[in-house]
Amino acid sequence: MSEIMNQETISSLSREIGEENIPVLLDIFLGELENYQATLSESEGPEQLELLKEISHALKSSAASFGADRLCAMAIDIDTRGKQGLLLNTKQEKQNLIKQLRETYTSYMSLVEHES
């Protein structure tokens, strides 16, 4: 199973953009995670499938950029199956993604708090 937070990716990002810029970008990433959690949690009915596909598609790149490997892998899986029409249990997929968003958020919040 992939890591929640890939420290190597974060270190590489820090070298590329400058360590002083990491807190700002992490705040943006954490805000995205919160918004996605809220949006998915509030969604019901037929809109769930479209939101799940949209959010997973958006998460693929942002999660990869920040080394959120487990979230990225899940987003890629959901996005791929969504494009193939293979998302069978939307409610369960949604709950799994919300859980992973929460775990990722908690993990990255601890990094932000540690940096402060």
Task: Locate predicted features.
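Long, amphipathic alpha-helical coiled-coil segments characteristic
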Residues: E8-I55, K91-V112
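Short acidic-hydrophobic sequence patches enriched in Asp/Glu that either
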Residues: M5, S61, E93
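Hydrophobic membrane-targeting segments
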Residues: M1-E3
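Extended, amphipathic alpha-helices with heptad-repeat/coiled-coil or helix-bundle character
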Residues: E32-L88
